[in-house]
């Protein structure tokens, strides 16, 4: 067994120097080729100062999920070094990255805010400027809109913020966001809506939808409620719902490819397993819940979703985020699914202290890109250099075949 493993490792560099999944063959040491028609791109954009995922859908429609931003060091724990440098604000990095890859440069089509925590919404910092009218501070979501406007925004509460958005950790950040929503919807033409659970039509393709009838995005969870395939079920009732458990979650499906993302709705909430049951079949990829914090990514959920790729956006120097015990459990699990774990950041002090543990990961450090080939039959995973704006490929994995959809199971509606 050991000899076989050594043989595989010796062959590995030759295998991963190039990988092609549409948009041209990607080569290690060269910039990632541009998106091309029919491909689906999922980019975990790394600034080490918040979570942000940028998607280019098969016809060029764009969707951004979250745009976290903070600059001050939390008192509880240290942050990773900011990327690409300490002088460039995270939202500027997000906008620059998106403009580089998006095929239509004028504006983003959709923005989904999963919940109202600073690492997804934006923290109010003394040095951040204000909007042109002075109505609100430019931070996270609001600053990204100032840099690169989006046409529609979806969150978990609009317009019922008084009744549904009372759980946020930072009332100041939420109040700032509400002022932004009021101003932008009234004066700038921004459309706003609450995520509709069970609805596969809230994020339609904008340019050539007729070419991609097997593409859809479905609302799965929000406000502690989960779509069970027939109805919306409240999994908290009169119990205490906290902000993480209120996160929005969506399932993106394209051909045989499925991707699930749900903010911080992890195992320390009541919705992780119900979301998996709602989806009811293996997925190719997912964002880890709550930065792979303790109690997330439980075995009952993994047994249903059986992910082949797990992407974690993390930015603190902590052995519990991502949690070492969960990395170990997932890597040793006999549950089906390749469970290749990719991390935007893990500090060198942690990897040096336990190199055997972190050697189980598929990739550490950088922007993480999942590129799905036209038709949704196969995909590749790329790690990109996050130290500059050339977006050089550091690692190329795949192509991987998607799991065929069971003949007796229809796509989630």
Identify what each model region corresponds to.
Residues 1-8:
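Bacterial N-terminal signal peptides that target proteins for export
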Residues 17-20:
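C-terminal motif of bacterial Sec signal peptides marking the signal peptidase cleavage site
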Residues 25-41, 47-48, 104-105, 110, ...:
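Flexible, acidic/histidine-containing loops and adjacent segments that form or flank the divalent-metal
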Residues 44, 49-52, 56-145, 223-324, ...:
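Active-site-proximal loop/helix segments of hydrolase catalytic cores
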Residues 69, 73, 330-339:
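Long amphipathic alpha-helical scaffold regions
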Residues 313, 323-333, 347:
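Conserved ATP-driven motor cores of ASCE-family P-loop NTPases powering translocation/secretion/packaging/pilus
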């Amino acid at each position: 067994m050991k000899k076989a493993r050594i043989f595989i490792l010796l062959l590995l560099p030759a295998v991963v120097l190039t990988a092609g999944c549409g948009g041209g063959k990607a080569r290690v040491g060269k910039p990632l080729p541009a998106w091309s028609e029919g491909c689906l791109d999922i980019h975990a954009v790394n600034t080490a100062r918040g979570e942000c995922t940028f998607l280019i859908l098969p016809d060029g429609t764009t969707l951004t999920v979250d745009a976290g931003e903070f600059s001050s060091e939390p008192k509880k724990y240290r942050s990773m070094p900011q990327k690409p440098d300490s002088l460039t604000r995270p939202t500027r990095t997000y906008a620059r990255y998106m403009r580089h890859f998006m095929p239509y440069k004028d504006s983003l089509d959709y923005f989904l805010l999963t919940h109202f925590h600073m690492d997804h919404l934006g923290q109010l910092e003394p040095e951040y400027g204000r909007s042109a009218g002075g109505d609100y501070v430019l931070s996270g979501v609001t600053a990204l809109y100032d840099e690169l406007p989006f046409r529609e925004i979806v969150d978990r509460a609009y317009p019922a913020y008084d009744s549904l958005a009372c759980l946020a950790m930072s009332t100041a950040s939420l109040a700032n966001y509400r002022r932004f929503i009021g101003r932008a919807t009234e004066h700038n033409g921004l459309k706003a809506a609450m995520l509709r659970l069970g609805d596969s039509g809230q994020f339609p393709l904008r340019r050539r939808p007729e070419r991609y009838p097997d593409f859809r995005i479905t609302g799965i969870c929000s406000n502690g409620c989960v779509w069970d395939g027939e109805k919306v079920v409240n999994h908290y009732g009169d119990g205490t719902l906290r902000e993480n458990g209120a996160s929005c979650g969506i399932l993106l499906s394209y051909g045989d490819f499925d991707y699930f993302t749900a903010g911080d709705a992890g195992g320390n909430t009541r919705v992780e397993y119900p979301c998996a049951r709602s989806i009811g079949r293996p997925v190719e990829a997912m964002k880890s819940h709550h930065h792979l914090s303790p109690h997330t990514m439980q075995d009952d959920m993994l047994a249903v979703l059986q992910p082949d790729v797990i992407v974690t956006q993390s930015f603190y120097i902590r052995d519990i985020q991502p949690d070492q015990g969960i990395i170990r459990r997932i890597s040793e699990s006999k549950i089906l699914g390749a469970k290749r774990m990719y991390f935007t950041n893990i500090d060198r002090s942690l990897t040096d202290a336990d190199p055997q543990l972190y050697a189980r990961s598929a990739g550490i450090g950088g922007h993480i890109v999942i590129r799905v080939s036209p038709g949704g039959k196969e995909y590749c995973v790329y790690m990109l250099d996050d130290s500059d704006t050339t977006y050089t490929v550091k690692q190329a994995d795949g192509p991987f075949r998607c799991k065929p959809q069971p003949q007796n199971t229809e796509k989630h509606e």
